[in-house]
């Protein structure tokens, strides 16, 4: 029984250390965008705007599929 508990504690410690390391070293999406050069940031913002418009169209299509009576 002692070996099982010891193994669980070590396993949790290793996984916890890995998770903490990941959280501390991975930058947030905003930080990545802010670190981009101005031309790439402008391109990113333009693509983001295009994606939001496309998502709006897809949302309208999904709504039309759910409620076909509201099309007229």
UniProtKB/Swiss-Prot annotation:
Please list every transmembrane segment annotated in the UniProt record, as residue ranges.
8-24
| Chief location bin | mitochondrion
The record's listing under InterPro entries reads:
Cbp4
Q: How does it sit in the membrane?
A: Single-pass membrane protein
Record localization = Mitochondrion inner membrane
Its GO biological process annotations read: mitochondrial respiratory chain complex III assembly
The protein's UniProt keywords, in alphabetical order, are: Chaperone, Coiled coil, Membrane, Mitochondrion, Mitochondrion inner membrane, Transmembrane, Transmembrane helix
Q: Which GO terms describe its cellular component?
A: mitochondrial inner membrane; mitochondrion
Of which family is this protein a member? Answer: Belongs to the CBP4 family.
What is the documented function of this protein? Essential for the assembly of ubiquinol-cytochrome c reductase. It has a direct effect on the correct occurrence of the Rieske protein, core 4, core 5 and apocytochrome b.
Name of the molecule in the record: Assembly factor cbp4
